[in-house]
Every structure is written in structure tokens, then in C-alpha cells.
């Protein structure tokens, strides 16, 4: 990744986010079910969809689950995989859409690495969360974050940048991982995180976030995840975490546990690179995090 893609708080991003904060989305009549893709006021190049369960009361604070799509941008399936979960828990689901190639340079992977050009994807997600609160008139506290494949790139790097915003995180089959490592530069390690993003890893806050890792035991393809010299995200040690997704996720588990984080690691028998199988395990994990649920009060 070019260093020019990682400069902290570019003028365009700061201006867009500042204007969004000054001009919140108007609160309209709250409806239940799925919304269309809603333009993000912080930066209309990006959008998000919500699932709102029925019978949310007044202006209460409710759980929020953010589900981040993979490389093919299946935002609807990312959202809908947690719809029944949301009904059970009285939770809202937010599924962002980070389109490929927003700068016209052929980069389809920018959101996975949190920044490209003037875009800070972590800040965009936080702007979407704030807009959703204003739009539907509900408050969210710390939220649950789930990501599969490309979305898992985003999820575990968001944990590094904003652990104080997370209630729990589920990381499913990422192609590459960033390890807590002060000796190696971003994105392989965290040495220059503070210079690039204005934040160093907050290990104390990270230890308060339960972490779920999930992958199929047949997720063994390597061609699409091997970094080669000259490729866009090549850097020294780019493949150091392992040859395939299973090995890389195991490296992430060991790294997080070595720094005191509580990690549940599911290896799913008979599954390859399978979103549905990983989402099922993620739902189980988040059920444990949120507790018994409130289905009688929130059933359709």
C-alpha cells in the first residue's frame, strides 16, 4: 500500500465528516424491516442499509450490529444474515457499502486496509452509525462488528483503531491479517499506526472486547491471497502470517491471545470459504455476548 494512501485526516475527509456532524440526518418516521441503500452524508460515494426490527420503543438505546461485506460487495446478504438475530435481540443491523475503485485507480481493496487517498473507512463507518442514530431516533452504545473475507480485513483492523467503540467483534476468514507488532510497519504490523492514523493500539481497551474468529477447515485456496512483489499491497513480510487463510487466522489468534485478549476460535468442519457457515457461528457468538434476547417483545 502506498504511503500516500494512509495520511491521517486528509482535508477532504475532515471536511466531509465535519459537515456531516454539523448537518445530521433528519429523523423521519421510523419503519421496520430493511431500508434501501442510503447515501452517507459524510461522503455520498458510500452508502449503507439498515435492518430495523419491529416494535422498537421510544428513544431507547438498543444494540447495534454492523456487518461488513466481502470483496464482491454482497451488502444485502451481509445484512440479511443477521435479520433474525436482530428480531430476537431487538437490535438494529447496519451494513455499509464500500464500492470498489472509488478513486478510479483500479483499487478494489481500499476499505480492507482502512485508508486510501482522502478516504478513511473507519471514520466513514462511525459517521454512518451517527447518521443511523439520527435517522431512526435511537441511540447506540458500543456495537457488535462482524466481517467475512474482505469484511474481516476491515473488522480486525477496526478493532486495532477503535476498540472503545466495540462490544464484540467477529472476524471470518480474512485473506490477510495485521498483527500487533511494534517492529513492523502497517499493514503487516502496528509500528507506525499512530503516525498514519493518529492512534496507537490501546491494549487495555482491546482486552475489553470479546473476539470471535471463524473459518472453514477446507478454506485452503491461496492464489487470491498471496502477496507478490510489485502488487498493490506488497511489503516485506506480507505473507509472514501463513500460506493460507487458516494459518493466517491462527497467527492472529495467537497474537491477540499473547496480548491478553479473550478469543473464541471456530474451525468449521466441511466448510470452505463459506459466508453462511461463518455467519452461523458469528450469530452464536453474538447471542452469547448479548444474552437471552427479547423475542416476545420484538416478534414480527
Annotate the PLM regions.
Residues 157-167:
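Conserved hydrolase catalytic core segment
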Residues 1-64, 146-148, 153, 162, ...:
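A domain-start/cap signature at the N-terminus of enzymes
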Residues 44-47, 54, 60-141:
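Serine-hydrolase catalytic machinery in alpha/beta-hydrolase-like enzymes
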Residues 168, 173-259:
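The feature captures the conserved acid-bearing segment of alpha/beta-hydrolase catalytic domains
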Residues 66-68, 172, 215, 268:
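Alpha/beta-hydrolase
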Residues 97-101, 175, 271:
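Short beta-to-alpha linker loops that shape the active-site pocket of alpha/beta-hydrolase fold enzymes
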Residues 247-300:
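C-terminal catalytic histidine-bearing segment of alpha/beta-hydrolase fold enzymes
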Amino acid at each position: 500500500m502506498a504511503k500516500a494512501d494512509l495520511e491521517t485526516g486528509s482535508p477532504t475527509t475532515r471536511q466531509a465528516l465535519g459537515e456531516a456532524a454539523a448537518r445530521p440526518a433528519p429523523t423521519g418516521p421510523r419503519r421496520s424491516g430493511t431500508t434501501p441503500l442510503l447515501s452517507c452524508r459524510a461522503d455520498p460515494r458510500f452508502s449503507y442499509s439498515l435492518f430495523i426490527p419491529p416494535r422498537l420503543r421510544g428513544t431507547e438505546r438498543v444494540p447495534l450490529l454492523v456487518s461488513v461485506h466481502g470483496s464482491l460487495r454482497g451488502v444485502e446478504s451481509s445484512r440479511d444474515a443477521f435479520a433474525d438475530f436482530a428480531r430476537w435481540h431487538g437490535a438494529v443491523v447496519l451494513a455499509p457499502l464500500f464500492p470498489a475503485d472509488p478513486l478510479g485507480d483500479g483499487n478494489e481493496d481500499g476499505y480492507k486496509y482502512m485508508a486510501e487517498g482522502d478516504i478513511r473507512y473507519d471514520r466513514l463507518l462511525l459517521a454512518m452509525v451517527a447518521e443511523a442514530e439520527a435517522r431512526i431516533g435511537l441511540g447506540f452504545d458500543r456495537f457488535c462488528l462482524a466481517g467475512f473475507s474482505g469484511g474481516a480485513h476491515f473488522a480486525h483492523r477496526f478493532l486495532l483503531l477503535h476498540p472503545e467503540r466495540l462490544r464484540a467483534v467477529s472476524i471470518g476468514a480474512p485473506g490477510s491479517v495485521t498483527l500487533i507488532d511494534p517492529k513492523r510497519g502497517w499493514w503487516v504490523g502496528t509500528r507506525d499506526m499512530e503516525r498514519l492514523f493518529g492512534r496507537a493500539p490501546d491494549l487495555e481497551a482491546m482486552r475489553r472486547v470479546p473476539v470471535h474468529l471463524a473459518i472453514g477447515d477446507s478454506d485452503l485456496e491461496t492464489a487470491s491471497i498471496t502477496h507478490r512483489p510489485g502488487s498493490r499491497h506488497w511489503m516485506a513480510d506480507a505473507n509472514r502470517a501463513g500460506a493460507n487463510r487458516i494459518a493466517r487466522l491462527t497467527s492472529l489468534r495467537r497474537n491477540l491471545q499473547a496480548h491478553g485478549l479473550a478469543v473464541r476460535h471456530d474451525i468449521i468442519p466441511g466448510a470452505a470459504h463459506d459466508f453462511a457457515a461463518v455467519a452461523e457461528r458469528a450469530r452464536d457468538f453474538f447471542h452469547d455476548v448479548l444474552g437471552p434476547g427479547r423475542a416476545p417483545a420484538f416478534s414480527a
